[in-house]
Amino acid sequence: MDKENSSMVTEFIFMGITQDPQMEIIFFVVFLIVYLVNVVGNIGMIILITTDTQLHTPMYFFLCNLSFVDLGYSSAIAPRMLADFLTNHKVISFSSCATQFAFFVGFVDAECYVLAAMAYGRFVAICRPLHYSTFMSKQVCLALMLGSYLAGLVSLVAHTTLTFSLSYCGSNIINHFFCEIPPLLALSCSDTYISEILLFSLCGFIEFSTILIIFISYTFILVAIIRMRSAEGRLKAFSTCGSHLTGITLFYGTVMFMYLRPTSSYSLDQDKWASVFYTVIIPMLNPLIYSLRNKDVKAAFKKLIGKKSQ
């Protein structure tokens, strides 16, 4: 039967990560632990930063927002994924699919700009330390974060409109574990050429603009570090930037692999595991990446634990 002659889709069925019932139980346990670590880590980071006055600085303000967006986009995906591991009826309505998609896209794209703002903050701290209080004032920090969330909102509306204005009238089986752009485009019975161009252009703009900010910031930072006479100063600068560079590499590497390529090169199995990595694993890793070697966060944690034990 031609797709055009089929009835319109009102719900989708996820194939999930695996069809093996035993593996589903194993994956449920593993990803439940990962998600709980994610939730505890990111909420813990938010609580530490908001309650400890020593962490009321631009760098930790941005880190608090990073934890929030990490928690946001992982929570748009993980609870549903965990529930689907325990059932054979992996059905999601068209409207619920659009809602899941919208929240996921909004938080992920906001994270791109939060990471760019963090790079700018490090640039000012290392390259313009005498002007730090001016360039990174409370008003500037708030404006940067509001701009990040506004960019996420605009992207949310654009992506959701472009993706869900397409016709879905043939198979309703999504070979994935959540509603994501590539499998939805592959499923549509519309001509997706224009939508693909617009969607990938928007993704490309978000990626390019934020990576450009990060690249320029770290180019100036690298030059400043090379010019430092003190080995201790260079070590401190590298320590300040190391965790952020690790987080950027993990996040952008996976997102670029997922979205900045045509659907003709789309590999279902590869992309499922890439999606698992950046929807579940990276949000869990970020609190660890940014806190393990951070003396201020460790001190705040010990202080908080000390207060509760008294």
From Swiss-Prot:
GO CC aspect terms: plasma membrane
UniProt keyword list: Cell membrane, Disulfide bond, G-protein coupled receptor, Glycoprotein, Membrane, Olfaction, Receptor, Sensory transduction, Transducer, Transmembrane, Transmembrane helix
Membrane topology value: Multi-pass membrane protein
CDD domains: 7tmA_OR5AR1-like
Disulfide-bonded cysteines: 97-189
Compartment(s): Cell membrane
UniProt KW Transmembrane keyword: yes
Chain ranges passing through the membrane: 29-49, 59-79, 101-120, 140-160, 206-226, 240-260, 272-292
PANTHER family: OLFACTORY RECEPTOR
Protein's recorded name: Olfactory receptor 5AR1
Organism: Homo sapiens
